[in-house]
């Protein structure tokens, strides 16, 4: 039996592992993927982070390369793999936990091949789990090509002609920008877009956000509450310029679909040929069969990652304790805090 098991060996799980390693804990990381970093490795081919390398680090190890440059997805996948190797973090791959229970003071983690036991558990599966596509998409004709943004790889994957990108987040914008070179692109958005430069006065925008106290704004502060009410901005002006030139057309929120017709909230319609649903992800915590671990809405029940269930913790959730909780640059702060809380119950 382990002192502690971390479910998920992505950026959040590895950051937690780093701090536990420093304190000599007997712990194990469980990773469902074939390799550490697959969540990055399997993203679309052209993906680059909008956080520069100097803001793309986990505790104790920097990303190789020029600090102001923007790492690609494969760099990040390699970095995470090398991070686990460098700190000799114990990771068990190809191990999906499909159920977790607590019997007396011991957690039981059910996998397809075994039941693992631990005194404490950190759930680091993150806030982005199952791709979400609106149910009305099922009413579209089979002739309409449809994929979720998590399945998108490159423009060659999309049939010739026009394409509708549904969703106004940074992933949707990056995909729309790439497709605008080869396809007629329309974006469906549900709110006005705000654009921020990647650099301002030769400094990364993230440097300015940090100086303004916004990058790591804490959950219940005035800055944090203000930030939570705002939609995430688009980073970079390439999309803005393509919208201005007409290379990317904008439409409102999609509310219904039938055959090859898409209906927007303003009453307009669109004849669909190909659709990329950049509509985000939903969290699924039904596999946690522990009373009080999950609230009535199905979300983790916690305060700054600490569950009311003794010995159970969460890490990597959006706004877990601060703005950077789900970002690679900020997850280490939460990991350090959780370590201090874990040590308290061991005293």
Predicted regions and their residues:
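Flavin (primarily FAD) cofactor-binding/catalytic cores of flavoenzymes
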Residues: 1-33, 38-39, 68-170, 174-347
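Glycine-rich flavin
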Residues: 49-68, 216-219
